[in-house]
């Protein structure tokens, strides 16, 4: 498993939103973003920025009660999931892997809030941990997870 991390200081909501816009502009279709952080840490703000980066015109709101919001008006579909109200065993019954596998829905970007409640994870994803620290504001730690083999450049 390939794993590195990048920490970004986000002084306010605007900075969190801008990070989301950058992600939305640069991530390819098929990307999965797992978001973790306390209430009010900026998960939904980040997803709203991703939507803006994808040129989605609709208002992006947290799907806390609907569980899944689908936005298809942008250049790539965005599937926004919120697992806050669910237990891990409930999550498996939703078959949300259909979203990252592109089964029954067009391939898009999948953003999952409260990802710690997710049982089975995709093979490749960005794990973003959002924390709030008194002095620094929000911190986003971005960890790309890749189940891929490294190429041995020494082997001919």
Where are these regions (language model features)?
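N-terminal pre-Walker A segment at the start of P-loop NTPase domains
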Residues: 2-22
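Walker A (P-loop) phosphate-binding loop of P-loop NTPases
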Residues: 40
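Conserved nucleotide-sensing/catalytic segment adjacent to the nucleotide-binding pocket
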Residues: 61, 70-114
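Short phosphate-coordinating micro-motif centered on Lys-Gly-acidic
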Residues: 4-6, 97-156
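Hydrophobic anchor at the beta1->P-loop junction of P-loop NTPases
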Residues: 33-35
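Conserved lysine of the Walker
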Residues: 43
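Conserved post-Walker A coupling segment in P-loop NTPases
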Residues: 31, 57-61
């Amino acid at each position: 498993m390939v794993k590195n991390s990048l920490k970004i200081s986000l002084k306010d909501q605007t900075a969190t939103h801008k990070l989301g816009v950058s992600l939305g502009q640069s991530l390819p279709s098929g990307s999965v973003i797992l978001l973790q952080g306390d209430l009010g840490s900026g998960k939904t703000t980040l997803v709203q920025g991703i939507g803006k980066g994808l040129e989605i015109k609709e208002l992006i709101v947290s799907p806390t009660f609907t569980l899944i919001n689908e936005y298809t008006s942008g250049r790539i579909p965005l599937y926004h999931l919120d697992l806050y109200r669910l237990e891990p065993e409930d999550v498996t019954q939703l078959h949300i892997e259909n979203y990252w596998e592109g089964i029954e829905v067009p391939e898009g970007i999948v953003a999952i809030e409260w990802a710690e409640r997710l049982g089975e994870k995709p093979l490749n994803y960005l794990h973003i941990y959002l924390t709030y620290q008194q002095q620094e504001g929000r911190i986003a730690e971005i960890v790309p997870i890749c189940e891929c083999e490294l190429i041995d450049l020494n082997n001919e």
